[in-house]
């Protein structure tokens, strides 16, 4: 064993050669199936598909004019199939993906080298619309090849076959419901689920076709998302601006009200109500500064002369409509340069528009309450969904000879043994997790830090957070910290009240200059405030000071639990070690120096086209592994590949060497946030980048790399078959449940692991897919290692849903978002959404996320 310093007892094995050029990068085959742990009977929300061994015929569809929404394209193709039934389609039931791809079970009478051009008329509101559709043969898609791949006779699952089956299974639901990604939604009949702010919850289902061992599977899950409520724009505005009714708004909107309203309605579709049956639709591009009574536009008169006319006057003259709310602004619709204005009162929000903007905190918690289902309830809902979807009577599914089993798939899983957790102090107590949780009572940190110089800065109002509150809080914190083995010696050297984000930097500078050896500043916040972002910006990036924020409510009323959680974070930020995995129980990979890397890229919220994406990579710095260092970069908007990975990994390897005096012989890389479609691209770029980082350090330095993608955003759920196995109020699967058969990839190395105890709703197991493995892990070794790493997250005494390095990478990227916040922009929404980084050049952004030298080697993100 190596302990972070001292000799390596086990000689390193010979390291594998560099991989061949990029085109040969291929995920490794599954080495074996795991056997560790006790078996557990489960059901998974995937349904076996019976696929015939036929050929499917693939045609390319080209619709002119282009760029119609998928819904319109589907209508065009449906009309085309009906209209040209006699000449071309006969009794065939083609399926269409809404873009370019059409599939049939029998070939169409179209020569392979010819293109057929048809004219299709869609009846429209007001006038008919005419489209030109060109059809040409593309390929035969062999379902036999799919069978061969699933049974292992062919190396790769043919992507085009899976895609064709997906289109077949989605064709009818796409016509019945509102498709969003791989899910389908419909407005809840009879029972609205309002979220506030003009938004509501729509329920639906996720559906996707997935290859697994021997069989194709249909993955079905319940799904929910936020849509905009179909309602008059006036009512929408009242919800957004928190007016009880429009009657209380007799004055024009203030600037801040108008800005807030514009932010919400911009980009939405509205339909007009003042032209009888012709409910023409427009997209909102802006909200006018001036009210309808004053907003003018150039009106061309019959004489050919152009005059400036107000919107209110125009509606009175042209539509005989006297506006009820001429003091309110207008919507500017269509193209901005065309000056088309509509009064709010003649517009409705069009139904079926999904909300892609970020939900507020209140909306998010309402959404969670509305959608959380215990595991047995979710299982029942999915079974109901399957019955109502009735795939086996779907005429399009039957056309292709596909059958789907009605029952969920039975799977045998295994519950892995949790690791033992070692504490410090005199007792060197050992904790054994039960259902993913353990207790720190009567235990002391493995390495506790003694705090001698510390300060309190209270940004909560003195009348709410009194000096008595602060005194009690200080006493209680000192007591709990002493019990935990992190003694806080004496009273704070400084304890003062302050107000607003602007006072953070001057106060912190004063503290740093006045109190030598200051270790920690505890900052008390009055709820959600821009002060938090500024504290972290100044502490992490400007002055290099350790800060711990505490909400005012936790100071007014202290509990041992919250104080204990605070101590977990403080000890780690100051360089302590809370606990470690019991060395005797760790997997064999620890016998040589090994570095664990976690990587994640976070993107700005949908609908934001300017803010950069943030890439974070963390690396373990000891043998436990407990301490981590972070690197972070800003990169191109929505860029998933980590652009500067080579330099980031190089930094971490140098830091590892400085901390341990060892060069890692193995690199275990947990990569979060990559979807299946990006596997090849990410593997190619990032594996080479890691290799490059090693070679740049030393020409012959070639540690073995294992590259694992961690996925949380999937729809596979596991349920206990035996009621007695269910855990907790939500009836979930036990922590440690692992599955690597039947519902996993037919040939590649992947597995599901639910490492945490589900508290609310249905547990989501994490999916791990090994894209590269020089270290030749067995299934048991990698599954046990991954599960143990889920127990090393420092913020709590429970196992978490993904390995600690991947979790830390997420925290680092999230913290960098705060570092980018401009302190002068306050925001009611909460600090991390306020006036960020727009228009700042790349260099300034890179500098903004650069952590201070004194903070660099600490776990400031904990």
Swiss-Prot record:
Its main location: cytoplasm. Residues 232-351 form the PAZ domain. Residues 590-593, 653-663 are annotated as: Interaction with GW182 family members. GO terms for cellular component: cytoplasm; cytoplasmic ribonucleoprotein granule; nucleus; P-body; RISC complex; RISC-loading complex. Signal peptide: none annotated. Residues 825-847 are annotated as: Disordered. Its EC number is 3.1.26.n2. Gene3D superfamilies: 3.40.50.2300, paz domain (2.170.260.10), Ribonuclease H-like superfamily/Ribonuclease H (3.30.420.10). Residues 520-821 form the Piwi domain. A divalent metal cation binds at residues 600, 672, 810. It is found in: Cytoplasm, P-body. Pfam families: ArgoL1 (PF08699), ArgoL2 (PF16488), ArgoMid (PF16487), ArgoN (PF16486), PAZ (PF02170), Piwi (PF02171). GO terms for molecular function: endoribonuclease activity, cleaving siRNA-paired mRNA; metal ion binding; miRNA binding; mRNA cap binding; RNA 7-methylguanosine cap binding; RNA endonuclease activity; single-stranded RNA binding; siRNA binding. One of its GO terms (biological process) is regulatory ncRNA-mediated post-transcriptional gene silencing. The keyword Cytoplasm applies. CDD domains: PAZ_argonaute_like, Piwi_ago-like. InterPro entries: AGO2 (IPR028602), ArgoL1 (IPR014811), ArgoL2 (IPR032472), Argonaute_Mid_dom (IPR032473), Argonaute_N (IPR032474), PAZ_dom (IPR003100), PAZ_dom_sf (IPR036085), Piwi (IPR003165). Its cofactor is Mg(2+); Mn(2+). The Piwi domain may perform RNA cleavage by a mechanism similar to that of RNase H. However, while RNase H utilizes a triad of Asp-Asp-Glu (DDE) for metal ion coordination, this protein appears to utilize a triad of Asp-Asp-His (DDH). Required for RNA-mediated gene silencing (RNAi) by the RNA-induced silencing complex (RISC). The 'minimal RISC' appears to include ago2 bound to a short guide RNA such as a microRNA (miRNA) or short interfering RNA (siRNA). These guide RNAs direct RISC to complementary mRNAs that are targets for RISC-mediated gene silencing. The precise mechanism of gene silencing depends on the degree of complementarity between the miRNA or siRNA and its target. Binding of RISC to a perfectly complementary mRNA generally results in silencing due to endonucleolytic cleavage of the mRNA specifically by ago2. Component of the RISC loading complex (RLC), or micro-RNA (miRNA) loading complex (miRLC), which is composed of dicer1, ago2 and tarbp2. Note that the trimeric RLC/miRLC is also referred to as RISC. Belongs to the argonaute family. Ago subfamily. This is Protein argonaute-2. It comes from Xenopus laevis (African clawed frog).
